[in-house]
Amino acid sequence: MIVDAHAHVFRPAGVSPRGVDALAPAQRDAPVEDLLSVMAEHGVGAAVLVPLDHHDDYVRDVLRSHPRRFAAVAVADPAVQGRGHGDPVDRLKQRRDAFGFQALRTQWLGIPGRPIRESPFFPVLRVLADEGLCLWTYLVPDQLPLADELARELPSLTMVLNHLGFCPHDMRVDSHGRPAFDDPFPASTRAQLQRLSRRPNVYVMFSGQYALSRREPPYTDLDEVVHEIAGAFGASRMLWASDYPWTREVPGYRSLLDLPRATFPQASPAELADIQGGTALRLFPHLRPAEDR
Protein backbone atom coordinates (compact mmCIF):
# COMPACT_ATOMS: atom_id res chain seq x y z
CA MET A 1 0.00 0.00 0.00
CA ILE A 2 1.25 3.48 -0.87
CA VAL A 3 1.31 5.93 2.04
CA ASP A 4 1.77 9.67 1.73
CA ALA A 5 3.85 10.29 4.85
CA HIS A 6 3.41 14.07 5.10
CA ALA A 7 0.44 16.11 3.89
CA HIS A 8 -1.20 19.26 5.18
CA VAL A 9 -4.95 19.78 5.30
CA PHE A 10 -6.57 22.98 6.53
CA ARG A 11 -9.49 25.30 5.98
CA PRO A 12 -9.67 29.07 5.60
CA ALA A 13 -8.81 30.76 8.88
CA GLY A 14 -12.36 32.04 9.23
CA VAL A 15 -13.72 28.49 9.02
CA SER A 16 -11.25 26.68 11.30
CA PRO A 17 -8.64 28.45 13.48
CA ARG A 18 -5.06 28.43 12.20
CA GLY A 19 -2.15 30.72 11.68
CA VAL A 20 -1.94 32.99 8.65
CA ASP A 21 1.19 33.83 6.66
CA ALA A 22 2.41 34.33 3.10
CA LEU A 23 2.33 30.59 2.41
CA ALA A 24 -1.11 30.02 3.91
CA PRO A 25 -3.06 33.28 3.64
CA ALA A 26 -6.40 33.44 5.40
CA GLN A 27 -8.48 32.29 2.43
CA ARG A 28 -6.24 29.43 1.28
CA ASP A 29 -8.13 26.15 1.51
CA ALA A 30 -6.88 22.54 1.48
CA PRO A 31 -9.83 20.43 2.63
CA VAL A 32 -9.40 16.74 3.30
CA GLU A 33 -12.00 15.92 0.65
CA ASP A 34 -9.62 17.21 -2.01
CA LEU A 35 -6.71 15.22 -0.62
CA LEU A 36 -8.85 12.07 -0.56
CA SER A 37 -9.79 12.67 -4.19
CA VAL A 38 -6.15 13.09 -5.21
CA MET A 39 -5.17 9.98 -3.24
CA ALA A 40 -7.93 7.91 -4.87
CA GLU A 41 -6.92 9.10 -8.34
CA HIS A 42 -3.34 7.96 -7.76
CA GLY A 43 -3.88 4.77 -5.78
CA VAL A 44 -2.61 6.07 -2.44
CA GLY A 45 -4.18 4.20 0.45
CA ALA A 46 -3.30 6.27 3.51
CA ALA A 47 -1.61 9.47 4.61
CA VAL A 48 -0.01 11.19 7.58
CA LEU A 49 -1.65 14.55 8.25
CA VAL A 50 0.24 17.52 9.65
CA PRO A 51 -1.50 20.73 10.78
CA LEU A 52 0.10 24.02 9.84
CA ASP A 53 0.63 24.93 13.49
CA HIS A 54 -0.54 24.12 17.01
CA HIS A 55 -4.22 24.52 16.13
CA ASP A 56 -5.40 20.91 16.27
CA ASP A 57 -9.10 21.38 15.51
CA TYR A 58 -9.40 20.48 11.83
CA VAL A 59 -6.99 17.54 11.72
CA ARG A 60 -8.53 16.26 14.96
CA ASP A 61 -11.97 16.22 13.32
CA VAL A 62 -10.60 14.54 10.19
CA LEU A 63 -8.90 11.86 12.27
CA ARG A 64 -12.13 11.12 14.08
CA SER A 65 -13.93 10.67 10.76
CA HIS A 66 -11.18 8.57 9.13
CA PRO A 67 -9.26 6.79 11.93
CA ARG A 68 -7.95 3.97 9.71
CA ARG A 69 -7.10 6.15 6.72
CA PHE A 70 -4.91 8.71 8.41
CA ALA A 71 -2.25 9.08 11.05
CA ALA A 72 -1.81 12.51 12.59
CA VAL A 73 1.05 14.71 13.73
CA ALA A 74 0.58 17.55 16.22
CA VAL A 75 2.77 20.65 16.08
CA ALA A 76 4.53 21.54 19.32
CA ASP A 77 3.71 24.96 20.72
CA PRO A 78 5.91 26.82 23.24
CA ALA A 79 3.90 25.37 26.14
CA VAL A 80 4.66 21.80 25.03
CA GLN A 81 8.31 22.72 24.45
CA GLY A 82 8.59 23.98 28.03
CA ARG A 83 8.98 27.58 26.93
CA GLY A 84 5.59 28.73 28.22
CA HIS A 85 3.73 28.63 31.50
CA GLY A 86 2.86 25.39 33.27
CA ASP A 87 4.10 21.81 33.03
CA PRO A 88 4.93 20.86 29.41
CA VAL A 89 4.07 17.20 30.01
CA ASP A 90 0.65 18.20 31.31
CA ARG A 91 0.14 20.36 28.23
CA LEU A 92 1.10 17.45 25.96
CA LYS A 93 -1.34 15.15 27.72
CA GLN A 94 -4.13 17.72 27.53
CA ARG A 95 -3.68 18.06 23.79
CA ARG A 96 -3.41 14.33 23.26
CA ASP A 97 -6.55 13.65 25.29
CA ALA A 98 -8.44 15.86 22.82
CA PHE A 99 -6.54 14.79 19.69
CA GLY A 100 -5.13 11.30 19.41
CA PHE A 101 -2.02 12.14 17.42
CA GLN A 102 0.76 9.63 16.83
CA ALA A 103 3.68 12.04 16.39
CA LEU A 104 4.81 15.51 17.45
CA ARG A 105 6.46 18.00 15.10
CA THR A 106 9.02 20.53 16.28
CA GLN A 107 11.56 23.01 14.95
CA TRP A 108 13.18 23.41 18.38
CA LEU A 109 14.83 20.92 20.72
CA GLY A 110 16.76 23.03 23.20
CA ILE A 111 19.31 25.75 23.79
CA PRO A 112 22.28 25.41 21.40
CA GLY A 113 25.45 24.49 23.23
CA ARG A 114 23.62 23.21 26.31
CA PRO A 115 23.09 19.49 27.07
CA ILE A 116 19.82 18.18 25.70
CA ARG A 117 18.91 16.81 29.12
CA GLU A 118 18.82 20.41 30.39
CA SER A 119 16.27 21.40 27.76
CA PRO A 120 12.81 22.26 29.12
CA PHE A 121 11.49 20.14 26.25
CA PHE A 122 13.34 17.00 27.36
CA PRO A 123 10.60 15.67 29.70
CA VAL A 124 8.15 15.72 26.79
CA LEU A 125 10.67 14.02 24.51
CA ARG A 126 11.08 11.30 27.12
CA VAL A 127 7.29 10.82 27.23
CA LEU A 128 7.26 10.43 23.44
CA ALA A 129 9.91 7.72 23.71
CA ASP A 130 8.12 5.95 26.56
CA GLU A 131 4.75 5.99 24.80
CA GLY A 132 6.02 5.02 21.35
CA LEU A 133 5.17 8.33 19.69
CA CYS A 134 7.33 9.66 16.85
CA LEU A 135 9.20 12.95 16.87
CA TRP A 136 8.67 14.73 13.53
CA THR A 137 11.60 17.13 13.17
CA TYR A 138 11.92 20.19 10.95
CA LEU A 139 14.88 21.75 12.70
CA VAL A 140 16.39 25.14 12.02
CA PRO A 141 20.19 25.09 11.53
CA ASP A 142 21.30 25.69 15.12
CA GLN A 143 19.08 22.84 16.36
CA LEU A 144 20.36 19.99 14.18
CA PRO A 145 23.43 19.25 16.36
CA LEU A 146 21.07 18.59 19.28
CA ALA A 147 19.28 15.87 17.32
CA ASP A 148 22.24 13.48 17.47
CA GLU A 149 22.63 14.07 21.19
CA LEU A 150 18.90 13.42 21.63
CA ALA A 151 19.13 10.18 19.67
CA ARG A 152 21.97 9.07 21.95
CA GLU A 153 20.17 10.03 25.16
CA LEU A 154 16.81 8.52 24.14
CA PRO A 155 17.68 5.63 21.81
CA SER A 156 14.10 4.31 21.88
CA LEU A 157 12.70 7.59 20.50
CA THR A 158 11.74 7.32 16.83
CA MET A 159 12.77 10.48 15.02
CA VAL A 160 11.65 11.34 11.48
CA LEU A 161 13.69 14.06 9.76
CA ASN A 162 11.35 16.00 7.51
CA HIS A 163 12.13 16.79 3.87
CA LEU A 164 15.47 15.01 3.43
CA GLY A 165 16.65 16.37 6.77
CA PHE A 166 17.40 19.84 5.47
CA CYS A 167 17.23 22.79 7.90
CA PRO A 168 14.74 25.48 6.86
CA HIS A 169 16.06 29.03 6.66
CA ASP A 170 15.13 32.18 4.76
CA MET A 171 11.98 30.69 3.25
CA ARG A 172 10.32 32.50 0.40
CA VAL A 173 7.05 31.72 -1.38
CA ASP A 174 7.48 31.07 -5.10
CA SER A 175 5.17 32.02 -7.96
CA HIS A 176 3.24 28.76 -7.51
CA GLY A 177 2.47 29.48 -3.86
CA ARG A 178 5.03 26.94 -2.61
CA PRO A 179 7.87 27.24 -0.10
CA ALA A 180 11.32 27.64 -1.64
CA PHE A 181 14.83 27.67 -0.18
CA ASP A 182 18.37 28.34 -1.38
CA ASP A 183 21.50 26.43 -0.32
CA PRO A 184 19.56 23.67 1.48
CA PHE A 185 22.47 21.29 2.07
CA PRO A 186 25.65 23.02 3.26
CA ALA A 187 28.51 20.73 4.25
CA SER A 188 27.64 21.05 7.93
CA THR A 189 24.11 19.73 7.39
CA ARG A 190 25.34 16.84 5.25
CA ALA A 191 27.85 15.85 7.93
CA GLN A 192 25.17 15.97 10.63
CA LEU A 193 22.86 13.78 8.53
CA GLN A 194 25.61 11.20 8.16
CA ARG A 195 26.03 11.10 11.93
CA LEU A 196 22.30 10.81 12.50
CA SER A 197 22.04 7.95 10.01
CA ARG A 198 24.07 5.80 12.42
CA ARG A 199 21.21 6.00 14.95
CA PRO A 200 18.87 3.12 14.07
CA ASN A 201 15.71 4.91 15.22
CA VAL A 202 16.29 7.97 13.02
CA TYR A 203 14.38 8.03 9.73
CA VAL A 204 14.32 10.52 6.85
CA MET A 205 11.52 11.72 4.63
CA PHE A 206 11.95 11.46 0.85
CA SER A 207 10.20 14.74 0.12
CA GLY A 208 10.64 18.46 -0.33
CA GLN A 209 12.73 18.31 -3.51
CA TYR A 210 10.40 20.76 -5.23
CA ALA A 211 11.33 23.44 -2.65
CA LEU A 212 15.07 22.73 -2.69
CA SER A 213 15.88 22.21 -6.38
CA ARG A 214 16.41 24.72 -9.15
CA ARG A 215 15.23 22.23 -11.79
CA GLU A 216 12.09 20.39 -12.83
CA PRO A 217 11.40 16.78 -11.75
CA PRO A 218 13.26 14.51 -11.26
CA TYR A 219 15.40 17.26 -9.69
CA THR A 220 18.74 15.94 -10.88
CA ASP A 221 20.66 18.82 -9.27
CA LEU A 222 19.91 17.11 -5.94
CA ASP A 223 21.05 13.65 -7.04
CA GLU A 224 24.39 13.72 -5.24
CA VAL A 225 22.99 14.65 -1.85
CA VAL A 226 19.85 12.50 -2.18
CA HIS A 227 21.91 9.41 -3.06
CA GLU A 228 24.26 10.22 -0.19
CA ILE A 229 21.29 10.32 2.21
CA ALA A 230 19.72 7.19 0.77
CA GLY A 231 23.01 5.32 1.01
CA ALA A 232 23.32 6.26 4.66
CA PHE A 233 19.74 5.56 5.79
CA GLY A 234 18.63 2.84 3.38
CA ALA A 235 15.15 2.37 1.95
CA SER A 236 13.88 0.80 5.17
CA ARG A 237 14.29 4.17 6.92
CA MET A 238 12.96 6.42 4.16
CA LEU A 239 9.37 7.62 3.74
CA TRP A 240 7.92 9.12 0.56
CA ALA A 241 5.68 12.16 0.99
CA SER A 242 3.96 14.68 -1.26
CA ASP A 243 3.88 17.72 1.02
CA TYR A 244 0.35 18.36 -0.28
CA PRO A 245 -1.17 20.92 -0.95
CA TRP A 246 1.88 22.96 -1.94
CA THR A 247 2.65 20.46 -4.71
CA ARG A 248 -0.86 19.70 -5.91
CA GLU A 249 -0.67 21.69 -9.14
CA VAL A 250 3.08 22.04 -9.68
CA PRO A 251 4.76 19.61 -10.12
CA GLY A 252 1.61 17.54 -9.50
CA TYR A 253 1.00 14.45 -7.41
CA ARG A 254 1.91 11.99 -10.19
CA SER A 255 5.33 13.56 -10.68
CA LEU A 256 6.09 13.08 -7.00
CA LEU A 257 4.83 9.50 -6.96
CA ASP A 258 7.17 8.73 -9.85
CA LEU A 259 10.14 10.36 -8.12
CA PRO A 260 11.49 7.38 -6.12
CA ARG A 261 11.80 5.22 -9.23
CA ALA A 262 13.23 8.10 -11.27
CA THR A 263 15.78 8.95 -8.57
CA PHE A 264 16.75 5.35 -7.78
CA PRO A 265 16.49 3.44 -11.08
CA GLN A 266 18.55 0.56 -9.65
CA ALA A 267 16.34 0.12 -6.58
CA SER A 268 14.63 -3.23 -6.12
CA PRO A 269 10.83 -3.53 -5.97
CA ALA A 270 11.14 -4.20 -2.23
CA GLU A 271 13.19 -1.03 -1.69
CA LEU A 272 10.72 1.09 -3.64
CA ALA A 273 7.84 -0.47 -1.70
CA ASP A 274 9.54 0.51 1.56
CA ILE A 275 10.02 4.11 0.47
CA GLN A 276 6.48 4.45 -0.85
CA GLY A 277 4.67 2.95 2.11
CA GLY A 278 6.35 0.05 3.86
CA THR A 279 8.41 2.23 6.18
CA ALA A 280 5.43 4.42 7.06
CA LEU A 281 3.30 1.35 7.80
CA ARG A 282 5.89 0.09 10.25
CA LEU A 283 5.77 3.43 12.07
CA PHE A 284 1.97 3.66 11.92
CA PRO A 285 0.74 0.04 11.87
CA HIS A 286 -2.91 1.02 12.38
CA LEU A 287 -2.88 2.20 8.74
CA ARG A 288 -2.32 -1.33 7.45
CA PRO A 289 -5.23 -2.88 5.58
CA ALA A 290 -7.31 -5.05 7.91
CA GLU A 291 -6.17 -8.25 6.23
CA ASP A 292 -2.51 -7.37 6.91
CA ARG A 293 -2.82 -6.48 10.59
Where are these regions (language model features)?
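Mid-to-C-terminal alpha-helical segments outside catalytic/metal-binding sites
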Residues: M1-A5, L23-A46, H227-E228, A232-L239, ...
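Active-site neighborhood of phospho(di)ester-bond hydrolases with catalytic His/Asp-centered motifs
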Residues: I2-A5, L49-V50, V73-A74, R105, ...
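Conserved, mostly hydrophobic/aromatic
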Residues: H6, M39, V59, L104, ...
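Active-site environment of divalent metal-dependent phosphoester hydrolases
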Residues: F10-A13, H54-D57, A79-Q81, I111-P112, ...
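Divalent metal-dependent hydrolysis catalytic cores, especially in the metallo-beta-lactamase
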Residues: A22-H54, R69-D77, Q102-L109, L135, ...
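Active-site gating/metal-coordination segments in enzymes
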Residues: D56-Q143, E149, D183-P184, Q209
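Catalytic pocket-lining loop regions of alpha/beta-barrel enzymes
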Residues: P115-L239, E291-D292
